[in-house]
Amino acid sequence: MKVLLSALLLLLFAFEPSASGKKLSDPVLSKRMELYHKIEAVTQIPWYALAAVDQYEENVRSNRKDLPEKAGIISIYIPDDIWSGPENPNPKDDAPLSIKVFDGIGMDGDGDGKAEVSNDEDILYTFSQYLLSYGTDEDNIRIGLWNYYRRDQTVGIISEFMKLFKAYGHIDLGEHAFPLPIRTDYSYRSTWGDARGFGGRRIHEGTDIFAHYGLPVKSTCYGVVEMKGWNRFGGWRIGIRDINNTYHYFAHLNGFAKGIKTGQIVEPGQVIGSVGSSGYGPPGTAGKFPPHLHYGMYKDNGRTEWSFDPYPHLRAWERYEYQKKK
């Protein structure tokens, strides 16, 4: 009976439109797009690859205190010793010739005769030339990214951003949606940080939204499905990465929406599964607690990933959807 109810509810909500409409054009995003396309025309490095690296770096800067503030609208960070050269006596060198002599990578991108690490076009052009040394196809770009960052997680995240930007043709993908259909029977409160005992003492890394079996669970963002499957704690669960380096975790599902697979692009409001009570045991275990959606959010800062409280975000998305439907 639960399976039949789940199927009917999924069909009912599968074609619900995205909860958040397209945002008004942001002049900063528009200017970035102009720069990406300008550098692409010169270097043949795809604009969406440059945009993905820049987006990743912007996210990292916003979550790290050891990195300097960006000077312009481009966030790609190239350390002085790499820009000017490791043996360069002038770490702030902006002369292309002497930078080259000392094996720096800094280049003049706007034709003013200077290679300035604070200049948006110089930064983009320099990084594009670095990637160009590996090739213009996506596989070789990923090799170049790995040699630059030396972190598999970073390359994977940037690759997901590339997929998103390439698919949509723009970078304005910051919209969100509440994970359950509003005006249905659900309840939740702030439970992040509460104690949990199953599998050893630990804290609760999310918010539990209690609802009936089979209620559709929706993607909260534009993103890429990084993970789908069983976990002894979370049961049937899905993990989605958005363009803000935030990993959205949906657990204790009753099942997945048809066709959902890892590597797939999803949108805000798209049905990805249904509410259940799976978990706390081997595959198929269910019913050890009331049906609910465990929703978690994790942030990556280029070094590590940590959980943060999703409750304020859920409240904001819920309010926004109610306002949209007034």
Curated annotation (Swiss-Prot):
Gene3D superfamilies, A to Z: Glucose Permease (Domain IIA)
Requisite cofactors: Zn(2+)
SUPFAM superfamilies for this protein: Duplicated hybrid motif (SSF51261)
Cofactor note: Binds 1 zinc ion per subunit.
Enzyme category, top tier: hydrolase
One of the GO biological process terms: cell wall organization
GO molecular function: metal ion binding; metalloendopeptidase activity
Entry's induction text: Expressed under the control of the late mother cell-specific sigma factor sigma-K.
Tagged with keyword tRNA processing: no
Top-level division of the source organism's lineage: Bacteria
First and last residue of the signal peptide: 1-19
Keywords, in A-Z order: Cell cycle, Cell wall biogenesis/degradation, Differentiation, Hydrolase, Metal-binding, Metalloprotease, Protease, Signal, Sporulation, Zinc
Binding site residues for Zn(2+): H204, D208, H292, H294
Enzyme Commission number(s) of this protein: 3.4.-.-
Function: L-Ala--D-Glu endopeptidase involved in production of single L-alanine side chains from tetrapeptides in the spore cortex peptidoglycan. Therefore, is required for the endospore cortex maturation.
Similarity field: Belongs to the peptidase M23B family.
Note: The presence of single L-alanine residues in the spore cortex increases the spores ability to be resistant to heat.
Protein name listed in UniProt: L-Ala--D-Glu endopeptidase
Organism: Bacillus subtilis (strain 168)
Upper taxonomic lineage: Bacteria, Bacillati, Bacillota, Bacilli, Bacillales
